[in-house]
Amino acid sequence: LTNLAFRSTAASEGTGFLLANGYYLSNSTAAAHGLGPLASRIQNEIISKFREMRLDRTELALLKAIILFNPGQAIDAIYATDLSTEGRRRLDVWRDDLYGSLHAYCTAVHSLGSARFTKLLLRLAPLRSISMKCLEHLVYTKLAAE
């Protein structure tokens, strides 16, 4: 979802999505396939904010790493049983390092670095929420097809 949003910042505002294979998916096509509300949320809550902030590739990479090492409560419960105490400690250290790296990058590159860091972190909640909705849609579509 983060890559889709980042690529789509290059498209005309609010018109659609640039897919990984280079194709363009218009909002009308997304709506015709039952993705209208989801597409609208992606446009309004993620793509427009990334475009407004002029998100760069370094920030994108750090956000993706933060998402990877901070997967959420359901996944954390799995990690808690699968990881050793040392493994959990290392994961926590890596999370802290990633947040610190993003903050350091924002303050080094942007005049209002701390504010930008905060704005970037505020994108994590919508990214997680929309990702879960995408997953629900995929599961529902698969179940409906069977």
Enumerate the predicted regions with their spans.
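Nuclear receptor C-terminal ligand-binding domain
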Residues: 1-146
